[in-house]
Amino acid sequence: MFICSLGAKIKVCGRHNVPKGGPFVVVINHFSYIDPPFVIHAVQRPISFLAASDQVITPLYLWAPFLYGFITTDRTRLAPSTIKKSIHALKSGDILGIFPEGTSLSRVLRPAKNGAAFLSAAGNTPMLPVGIVGLE
């Protein structure tokens, strides 16, 4: 699925690929702090995102808990507590959103980390790849 922002207009391509029910892992490229609302708009279901623990306390994230859930994670390693919370969310039927590049505010696509694939396999859930263009 692709999400394209053309000014204020949002175009979603491939929405038919979004699973109709059940849990899954949404794997998204990450260019901006405003990526999560675009993904929620495209998927049209609540999503809990993995968020870097050092970013959760910044003013840019103060609005996040009101719009969607998040599970904090360490940028450098996938901690056991993050794994447990993420798998619990998937087993409870939630959708888990992961930005596998591990950071935002980049103008180029960065190499992905393997946590999304690990959590998808551990939770026995499908992955939905999502590409965002137009925000870089």
Model-flagged regions — what are they?
Residues C4-E136:
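Soluble catalytic domains of membrane acyltransferases
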